[in-house]
Each structure stands twice: as structure tokens, then as C-alpha cells.
Amino acid sequence: MISDNLMLNNDKTEFLIIGTRQQLAKVNINCIRVGSTDVCPVTVARNLGSWFDEQLNMSTHISKLCGVAFYHLHNIKRIRKYLSRESTEMLVHAFITSRLDYCNSLLYGLPNYQLNKLQRVLNASARLVCNAPTFCHISPLLRGLHWFPVKARIEFKILLITSKQFTDLLLNICAIY
């Protein structure tokens, strides 16, 4: 690596062993040596803004995402009385829904109890934008804002990525002929 002018950043280098609980119990790796550096395994690693854990159940990613989202919701709620509905919606899109939509295709197939945590964030965001009471029915608010539920947002993102790939493939084929 040194001959290629590459060096590891010791503070950021980590590795993750992925498997089921039973598989992880059988593995006993303390550290691996890369060049002159010992790299020890971690239970959670961050890559491109997503948190991955040993069992790939995304629980760490979801809990950190919910924590950050509720923090921003709290801050927006403090200044809500000074904002119009449109500005509140813009802030919610900038700070909350953009985070919910980032890498959400990784969440496809997770159990409902995991996705319900993200749905609570989306529901609280809709209530904040519409200035609705805490216990009002959420479906009309989401419909009025034209927001999909979390599970539908994930499926929509996957369909969008797939259709873009097919469109690009067709354009490349048409360019050949």
C-alpha cells in the first residue's frame, strides 16, 4: 500500500464480522493485521451515512435515525409559531424526510416493528407541519400532504431505481442500433 502512496487512517479503519448470533459465537477473531496496523473488529460500522451491525438487522441505523429526526423535530417545533405551513414543510423535508429517504432501500424486508419506528417519525412530522393535535387521525394528514407511508416510500424508491436502470439500458441499446 505504501508503494501506491496509500495509507490507512487508524482512527477510521474498522472491520465488521457479519452473521447470525450462532455464527458469530463460533468466530473468535481479535484483530487482523493490515500493513503495520492492527485492526480490531467492531459491532457497528458506519458506511456512507448508514449504520450496519453484525446481524444486518439495521436496528442501530433506525435508532440513530429516529434520534436525529426527533431532535430536529423538537427544534422545528420550538420555532413553529413563527413559521408558515410552507416554510415548516420545507424545514421538515430538509431535515427529516430527506434522512428517512436516504438509503431507505436497504430497509426493504425489515419487520414491521422496525419500520413502525420510522413511521412514528413521519407521523410526528406530518402533525407538526399541519399543526395538528397529538392524538388526531394521521391518514388524512398524510394524504393531504401527499406523503406515502414509510413502507410505501421504500417500495417506491426500489421501483424508481429499477425503472431508471431499465430506461438507461434501453437508451444504450437504442444508441447501438
What is the meaning of each model-derived region?
Residues 1-177:
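Hydrophobic/basic alpha-helical segments
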